[in-house]
Amino acid sequence: GMMWNNRYLKANNLPAPKEWIDMADPIYFGHTGMSAPSRSGTTHLTVETLLQGDGFVKGWGKMKSIAANFKTVTARSFGVPDGVNSGDFGVGIVIDFFGLSSIGSGFPVGFVYPTVTTLVPANIGVITNAPNEKNAKLFIDFLLTPEGQEILLDPKIRRLPVNPKTYSKAPKDFPNPFKDSSIGAAVKFDVQLSKGRYNLVNSLFDVMITYRLDDLRAAMSAIYEAEAKLGNKNNPKAKKLIAEARALVAALPITEAKANDAEFNKIFKKKRKKAKDIEKYAGTRQAEVEAEWDKFVIDNYTNAIKKAEEAIKSL
């Protein structure tokens, strides 16, 4: 979902977002943040939820429109709630317990589940040949007891219990997935689909957003300027150029069919924290594909700026 800093929003005269698309509004330019799915499993689930909820092409288009407003892509998932809590940026895309625990800890923040969301269980288990297998099983059993479930309501934890009865002891306004239809699993999450293209989706996000955030922001900033100048004017040429610029930003360097191809996904084995880390696996098929994607993305963002600037000149 989305968490926000109430003081930050008030100081910058910004409304609290309710849906994913709200975060694509130009008013949030430079006021939002998110971690990269390649650095956070929960963030990956958020991205995949958008792709499955809206469809691959439309989902990526929405994701890039949202990302264009980012002030930063944080190095770790914890960096998002930290950024919102401290007021470094106003709104962050997070897993729910980051927002709920911040509220419980007294930070001036809010949190909302957008309509397109999914519920993902947190797993617990005993590893094979565990040195303390008996105690591990006892711990799991304890977590499922009423007392163990109530621990999840602790202000510093704030996870959703699996026992419906536990919610009777939850604080006021605490989300209850068993009763509140607004936080139901709106997306029937396809785990196998997500698993099959996991590394590809992470690489694609990094190439289009993480490593090219400045370029993406520049492209959308130019488009925002053109749209603002156009306003309600009747200028077909400018409208066409702006539409073409937006299409260039939204365009993908890969089809959905290719992204779901099992054999193609096998080439994505390497992870990198920085763009230049691609040098570590230079010569591999993955490096070649990512380089092709990068050229496609840069060319499109650059041409989008040119289209937007041409639109401005025509007004």
In which residue ranges do the predicted regions lie?
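Structural recognition of the beta-strand scaffold that forms the well-ordered cores
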Residues: 1-3, 31-35, 90-94, 110-113, ...
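Extracytoplasmic ligand-binding site segments that recognize negatively charged/polar headgroups
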Residues: 1-74, 78-85
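A bilobed periplasmic-binding-protein/Venus flytrap-type ligand-binding module shared by bacterial periplasmic
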Residues: 3-8, 119-133, 151-152
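Periplasmic-binding protein-like
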Residues: 62-67, 104-130
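A ligand-binding cleft/hinge motif common to bilobed small-molecule-binding domains
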Residues: 85, 90-108
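Mature extracytoplasmic/periplasmic domains
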Residues: 127, 132-193
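C-terminal structural cap/anchor segments
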Residues: 167-237
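C-terminal non-catalytic accessory extensions
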Residues: 226-315
